[in-house]
């Protein structure tokens, strides 16, 4: 079987890891292996391809099982382990590899994210520690269109997180890279663009100012800060050119193309190690190694064959790389460029320099901009209208000037002379100053788009193919049909009698969306934390991705886990009204007796009492929403005292189809009397898995179930959506119904929420 065919089999074999709801067990894997071995005995390329694909499927599934093994066997108790740090902020956040557990070596080492202080030695990468750890499986929030942290953690081979109970340094020496980075950081203290230089040269993005990150995102130039193919290939090219230059003064018998090629590969690996050998850099090195091997084979390979072999080798070496968004961005970008230059090549012309170079750059950047639209929209929910202009400025400055200057300065930093190093750093700093001066002159070009645009985003690919085949001449009806299908989401309207309530997965907090006819209301806005809030991270992106116009906010009470995202949401939709029991300026009242209508739905406030001056959980705004057939009771954080007072005054109006479980399922709420008076069919609870209060309480869950309620909670189900219509109502949970993936599962102990 030829190598490209084998690579194609590998890619096909690993793709199921993206969609499998559960991983096949030992019996299924043994059966697949036996079938593959039986097929190998038969003749024919197709049969051999099926057999090899089956064997590689088994390999991929075994790798996934191995990645999940720590979540089943290393959690649930305090463990003593030896950890080698690979990354640290020097304070309370550390990433590393567990290499020994209770005296036994772990192979492969288990990646872990740790929280806590390491004393007395200051933490740095490369240190070897003996730690007492409280480990737990990775668990992330899951919302439609949101960041998938569980998938990301498994792609990075970090299935565990934990707290440091105790630690002692076995070897406090920092790694060579950490020492070199510290030396470089001290050397660059006086340069204004030192953070960007460290990012471009060493892959250190943590120190980048937020303003620079936002600017690069809005201009579509963030990819330049990732240490991956561009920088590593550039480092390899510099080494190759240097060695080719040296060969000019050597005897003829010592001149050859193999030595510079291998030296370039060695230089790429060395540079990737220097930048921390992150997974994208490691994949780039593997791809370069495959390219070198194909070049050394003496055969001619097409661009598509090289692409297949590189991607196949990466997935065989690391099957979980199939979960990595960065891998697919890189692979899609390279495939798009091959497609662009083969299907829409730049016409041969008589342009002279510099116009020839400028036109070639515009052609290249146009291909990248247009053909990457589907992935960019899917991953980032928007496009940069200024990305083409920004990259026409940034790519030449960074690749031809800034990065070569930085790499050369990093080499000179090892040996001197200091004056040469200073000149190189100064030149790189000035190049970056010019770059960001230009980027800041561009208008804010970031355009947020919703899910309807996903189909339209593949139009550039179809237009290029249609132009080459002249489809508009031969099959105009087909072209019009395809265009109609791509634009169909824009004309599709939800049923007039349908409305939805979605409980977003915001961790230990509450945020619910009521939507109808393309409009939306919020009940609470989730928690906030020092670096951000749920409004920025979850609510605003979710509403925009689903093409919803926010018209109002109901705020249950003043606690931070319920109003944390309020300011961010109001900044995005300043015209939205706010209704709460707090009596704050510009807030509409939410007290017992208040009634209003919105989009044909009836809203009735049941608590707190008018004129009440109480604060806290028992002052929560309780609202009942109904459409005449079905209803839902939103309770905020009321506790038993408020429940009993509300029932004594308003018990006839509490009956509802569903209830939002009060106070995240705390044992101080959800009294048996409330559950009986509501007499609902389902209960929805919002909490985080690892909350300090172990909510929802086991007793509360049993209380609801004993009364016949179906129980749904965001730690288990992720985002929960209830669809109400004339036919009744349905509940769709994201984790186990809409997106049931093996990497979305609840790992570890079934009842562990603490």
Which sequence ranges carry the predicted segments?
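Metallo-beta-lactamase
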Residues: 550-561, 659-663
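Membrane-interface helix caps and helix-loop-helix hairpins in membrane proteins
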Residues: 272-281, 296-300, 317-327, 374-377, ...
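Cap/insert and terminal regions of metallo-dependent hydrolase folds
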Residues: 643-718
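Aromatic-rich juxtamembrane segments at the membrane interface
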Residues: 155-285, 292-293, 422, 568, ...
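Core dinuclear metal-dependent hydrolase active-site scaffold
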Residues: 315-316, 320-322, 440-548, 552, ...
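Active-site HxH/HxHxD metal-binding segment of metal-dependent hydrolases
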Residues: 554, 558-593
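Membrane-interface helix/helix-cap signal primarily in integral membrane proteins
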Residues: 54-223, 533, 537-541, 545-549, ...
């Amino acid at each position: 079987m030829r190598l490209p065919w084998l690579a194609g089999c590998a890619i096909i074999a690993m793709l199921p890891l993206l969609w499998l709801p559960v991983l096949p067990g030992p019996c299924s894997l043994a059966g697949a292996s036996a079938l593959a071995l039986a097929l190998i005995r038969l003749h024919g390329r197709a049969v051999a391809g099926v057999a090899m694909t089956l064997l590689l499927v088994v390999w991929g599934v075994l790798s996934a099982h191995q990645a999940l093994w720590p979540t089943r066997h290393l959690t649930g108790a305090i463990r003593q382990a030896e950890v080698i740090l690979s990354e640290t902020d020097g304070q309370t956040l550390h990433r590393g590899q567990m290499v020994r557990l209770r005296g036994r070596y772990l192979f492969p080492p288990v990646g872990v994210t740790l929280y806590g202080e390491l004393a007395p030695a200051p933490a740095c990468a490369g240190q070897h520690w003996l730690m007492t750890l409280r480990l737990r499986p990775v668990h992330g929030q899951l919302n439609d269109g949101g960041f998938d942290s569980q998938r990301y953690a498994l792609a990075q081979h970090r299935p565990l997180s934990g707290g440091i109970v105790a630690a002692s340094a076995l070897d406090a020496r920092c790694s060579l890279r950490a020492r070199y980075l510290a030396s470089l950081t001290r050397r660059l203290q006086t340069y204004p663009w030192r953070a960007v230089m460290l990012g471009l040269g060493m892959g250190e993005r943590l120190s980048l100012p937020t303003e620079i990150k936002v600017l690069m995102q809005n201009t579509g130039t963030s990819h330049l800060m990732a240490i991956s193919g561009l920088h590593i290939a550039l480092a390899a090219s510099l080494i190759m050119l240097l060695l080719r230059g040296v060969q000019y003064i050597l005897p003829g018998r010592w001149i050859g193309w193999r030595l510079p090629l291998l030296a370039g590969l060695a230089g790429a690996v060395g540079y990737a190690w220097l930048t921390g050998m992150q997974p994208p850099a490691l994949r780039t090195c593997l791809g370069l190694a495959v390219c070198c091997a194909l070049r050394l084979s003496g055969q001619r390979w097409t661009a598509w064959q090289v692409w297949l072999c590189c991607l196949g080798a990466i997935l065989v070496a690391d099957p979980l790389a199939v979960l990595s968004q960065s891998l697919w961005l890189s692979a899609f970008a390279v495939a798009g460029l091959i497609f662009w230059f083969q299907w829409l090549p730049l016409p041969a012309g008589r342009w002279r320099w510099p116009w020839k170079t400028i036109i070639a750059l515009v052609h290249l950047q146009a291909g990248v901009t247009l053909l990457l639209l589907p992935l960019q929209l899917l991953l980032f929910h928007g496009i940069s209208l200024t990305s083409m202009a920004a990259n026409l400025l940034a790519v030449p400055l960074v690749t031809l000037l800034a990065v070569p200057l930085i790499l050369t300065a990093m080499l000179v930093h090892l040996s001197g002379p200091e004056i040469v190093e200073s000149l190189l750093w100064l030149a790189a700093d000035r190049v970056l100053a010019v770059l960001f001066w230009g980027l800041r002159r561009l208008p804010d070009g970031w355009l947020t788009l919703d899910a309807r645009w996903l189909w339209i985003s593949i139009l550039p690919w179809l237009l290029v193919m249609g132009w080459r085949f002249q489809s508009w001449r031969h099959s105009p009806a087909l072209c019009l049909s395809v265009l109609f299908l791509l634009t169909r989401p824009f004309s599709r309207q939800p049923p007039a009698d349908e409305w939805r309530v979605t409980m977003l997965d915001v961790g230990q907090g509450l945020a619910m969306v009521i939507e109808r006819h393309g409009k939306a209301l919020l009940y609470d806005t989730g928690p906030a934390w020092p670096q951000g809030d749920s409004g920025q991270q979850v609510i605003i992106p979710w509403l925009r991705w689903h093409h919803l116009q926010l018209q109002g906010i109901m705020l249950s009470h003043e606690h931070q886990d319920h109003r944390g995202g309020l300011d961010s949401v109001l900044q995005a939709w300043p015209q939205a009204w706010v209704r709460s029991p707090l009596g704050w300026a510009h807030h509409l009242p939410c007290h017992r007796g208040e009634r209003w209508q919105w989009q044909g739905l009836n809203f009735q406030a049941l608590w707190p009492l008018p004129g009440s001056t109480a604060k806290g959980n028992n002052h929560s705004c309780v609202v009942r929403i109904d459409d005449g057939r079905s209803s839902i009771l939103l309770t905020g954080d009321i506790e038993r005292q408020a429940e009993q007072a509300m029932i004594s005054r308003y018990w006839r109006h509490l009956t509802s189809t569903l209830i939002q479980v009060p106070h995240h399922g705390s044992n101080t709420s959800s009294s048996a009397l409330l559950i009986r008076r509501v007499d609902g069919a389902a209960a929805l609870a919002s909490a985080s898995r690892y909350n300090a209060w172990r909510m929802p309480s086991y007793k509360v869950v049993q209380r609801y179930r004993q009364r016949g309620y179906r129980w749904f909670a965001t730690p288990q189900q992720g985002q929960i959506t209830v669809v109400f219509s004339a036919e009744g109502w349905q509940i769709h949970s994201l984790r186990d119904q809409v997106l049931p993936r093996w990497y979305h599962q609840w790992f570890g102990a079934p009842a562990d929420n603490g």
